[in-house]
Amino acid sequence: MLLLWLSVFAASALAAPDRGAGGRRRGAAGGWPGAPNVVLVVSDSFDGRLTFYPGSQAVKLPFINLMKAHGTSFLNAYTNSPICCPSRAAMWSGLFTHLTESWNNFKGLDPNYTTWMDIMEKHGYRTQKFGKLDYTSGHHSISNRVEAWTRDVAFLLRQEGRPMINLIPKKTKVRVMEGDWKNTDRAVNWLRKEASNSTQPFVLYLGLNLPHPYPSPSSGENFGSSTFHTSLYWLKKVSYDAIKIPKWSPLSEMHPVDYYSSYTKNCTGKFTKKEIKNIRAFYYAMCAETDAMLGEIILALRQLDLLQNTIVIYTSDHGELAMEHRQFYKMSMYEASAHIPLLMMGPGIKANQQVSNVVSLVDIYPTMLDIAGAPLPQNLSGYSLLPLSSEMFWNEHKLKNLHPPWILSEFHGCNVNASTYMLRTNQWKYIAYSDGTSVLPQLFDLFSDPDELTNIATKFPEVTYSLDQKLRSIINYPKVSASVHQYNKEQFIKWKQSVGQNYSNVIANLRWHQDWLKEPRKYESAINQWLKTPH
């Protein structure tokens, strides 16, 4: 039934728009004549490589495939910080993480920060938000904060439970992530009751929590674990035979930051191939459920005759490692964590186009303003994606000059014991750490080594040096790292003073309690030594 509907859909709702009504750019700042509506759907933890071959073979994603066929897909889109709040802060501000000082899941934008949605509202758009936002300061657990603040301390503590899977008993259950479905329903109802009757163009944002792993409510050995949770209905969308078992480096050969991450994520123990494959299968099933919610929005737009004048954008805050590089979650510059989906469909957007240029989430802000015809602030880190996706600009030579040939991503939060900076160009991925000297950098040739298994930084010193110089021209990363060190220490001292002398007992009840309770005096001593050490 879905295939039949998609064929009808392709012939009608997404027919090429009249070039007189759309598809033209207005001035240098841009803007579509006729002020199209915009719908932005942002999921959590979606590996962008699933939206194109060969990753797309592992799971059925019909509505993402629909957007690919009738719109533009960006093959090399990246998060600007592979963790929820800092990534979303970059998307809503159009600025790199270090410019807004969105250092961790607790430290994001000021609640009164002017976002692209605020500007679109001032330019005549009716605006609405549903679901997960998570770009302002003050959220997330004490565990998450303390773990981020103390990452400079010289100890190793498991901060996560071992990743798990859970198949719900009801085989036919479709709405597994009920909270996301409720927000999707709210968005659809708003389209029907408000947007369809509005004389203004509208911009609708829907934030989904899927396919982020679920927190485990269990206690005991797996307390605090993350659970990949789904039903048989969604597992049937996964091609089990197409699931790739990732290669792992021996623990003794891992990069020191990778080892720290793997240890704190409780992934240094033994995992069978079946365990790994099941975790990945359940994750892909959660991606299929995410795709269905995106589909509900597209279906509603079609049914309300809004689709022909609505630009639909789908992306995610970051990816999910799903046991690649012996890790789950994100917090890494490896492809599974940093590579995100980014698809655009609608009036003036070229159909069935794949753009290989590197782009990132800071590009959402100028893109939104460009659609609205609003002037672009000069201080933005991002660039409008309209020239890359427009029917009028499809020229290989011009495309190279429409966006810088690099993107920047940085990470300063928990589960990683050094500030991390990634410069991605067409062929290379360069990853620098901390002050640039105390931790060895990494260099990967993504053309010959897409799985990022061989660090060639010392083998190609000229390339490494050149990329490091380029990175330093964009961001003074040793200085930023020092600022984060100081921030972490100041925040921990404030928190420690707020809980009094029993702070050790408080820590003993956080996620890392199992390790802390074995040798509390040892870890208290390590913290005291860290607090005394000047940076």
From Swiss-Prot:
One of its GO terms (cellular component) is lysosome. The conversion to 3-oxoalanine (also known as C-formylglycine, FGly), of a serine or cysteine residue in prokaryotes and of a cysteine residue in eukaryotes, is critical for catalytic activity. The 75-kDa precursor undergoes proteolytic processing to yield a 23 kDa form. Binds 1 Ca(2+) ion per subunit. The active site is at 84 (nucleophile). Disulfide bonds: none annotated. The modification 3-oxoalanine (Cys) is found at residue 84. It is found in: Secreted; Lysosome. This is Arylsulfatase K. It comes from Canis lupus familiaris (Dog).
